[in-house]
Regions:
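Gly/Trp-centered helix-boundary motif
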Residues: 2-169, 173, 317-320, 324-338, ...
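Alpha-helical transmembrane segments of integral membrane proteins
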Residues: 139-356
């Protein structure tokens, strides 16, 4: 006990010595007292972002999506200005200049690029045809300028894809919204009708529709829209089933909001992200399907053209004049690839669960 008391007294002495040393080492004059003016101090606030601003920020971080977006913009610009910057019309024929290879000034001096105007045998095809003007993408078997026809075809393919997607959005959103909002027997009947339509092969429906009516761009668009809206309707129906029992919808319903107001003011705006993403995947699907129809010979009628029609025309000349197939096929492939890259980036930006 005596030993413990001695230890305690020693510890107390050390503590008192430390406190004395600390108080002597730090004087009050070492501190500077300043008055704080809250009105002049900068406020540290985080910039608030809404849903669309946050989605745009996420999209910009996705490098592949940015590449797809830039590529799409470039192709769309060339689709509209490409036929204009060339003096040749897309339907103009000159059989004396048929099957000429691509020749682009300046680039024809680069040895490894296929823009020197020489044929498969290494001969100057322009000199043999006595052609004094350059055809940037060459000519086809009828002597039509492939530069103008390629970008005119891209323009028509984009038109078909975008308009078909808009029709799919309109029909699918209306059908899916009604089915998902009302539910019950209405939903059951509408879904059975949808299953019957979906059981019919899409290709057979489109081919029969195109063969019965006069072939045209609008015939192809309407034919693709017969069954193209089914996927959109399922997406919208699922969103409505998820949102119609949410608190903000039930609160508006309790306050006496009409069904029209509930659908178009409260529920539908909250499904726009799913609609945008689905529609962005619909456009390349429609472009590819139109190219397939043109490839089997029931696409856009002559003299109009599309990328699919150009690929079909160039297929017969593949072994002799490969540029007639490779150039439109490359533009078509890049167009669909850029659409899918951009669409995939949109899906990741709109869906927080997909973000890394």
């Amino acid at each position: 006990m005596a030993e413990n008391k001695n230890n305690l007294s020693i510890n107390d002495d050390h503590s008192n010595a430390a406190m004395t040393h600390t108080s002597d080492a730090i004087a009050s004059s070492d501190f500077i007292i300043r008055e704080l003016d809250l009105n002049q101090e900068p406020e540290m606030q985080r910039e608030s972002k809404n849903f669309w601003q946050d989605a745009w920020a996420q999209l910009k971080r996705n490098k592949l999506a940015v590449v797809g977006m830039i590529g799409l913009i470039i192709i769309v610009i060339f689709a509209f200005i490409g036929p204009v910057i060339n003096k040749h019309d897309y339907a103009e024929q000159n059989v004396e200049h048929r099957n000429l290879p691509a020749k682009i000034p300046v680039l024809d001096k680069v040895p490894f690029l296929p823009f020197d105007g020489k044929d498969a045998d290494g001969k100057d095809a322009y000199k043999a045809a006595n052609a004094k003007e350059n055809y940037w993408f060459g000519t086809d078997q009828l002597g039509r300028d492939l530069w103008t026809r390629t970008w005119k075809g891209a323009q028509i393919s984009l038109f078909i894809g975008v308009v078909a997607a808009m029709l799919d959005i309109f029909i699918g959103v209306v059908y899916g919204a009604i089915s998902g909002f009302f539910g019950g027997r209405v939903d059951t009947i509408m879904q059975r009708i949808l299953e019957v339509i979906a059981s019919i092969p899409n290709l057979i429906v489109v081919i029969l529709f195109v063969l019965i009516f006069e072939p045209s761009i609008w015939t192809i668009i309407l034919a693709m829209s017969i069954t193209g809206w089914l996927g959109m309707s399922r997406v919208v129906r699922g969103e409505f089933l998820k949102l119609k029992n949410q608190e903000f919808v039930m609160a508006s319903k309790t306050l006496g909001a009409s069904k029209f107001k509930l659908i178009f003011k409260h529920i539908l705006p909250n499904t726009l992200d799913a609609i945008v993403v689905t529609s962005m995947f619909t456009v390349p699907s429609a472009i590819f399907f139109e190219a397939f129809l043109s490839f089997i010979g029931i696409g856009v009628p002559a003299p109009q053209t599309s990328l699919g029609s150009l690929v079909n025309d160039g297929r017969a000349m593949l072994l002799i004049y490969p540029h007639e197939l490779f150039i439109p096929a490359m533009i078509l492939s890049l167009l669909i690839l850029f659409f899918y890259l951009f669409s995939d980036g949109l899906r990741d930006a709109f869906d927080p669960k997909m973000r890394k």
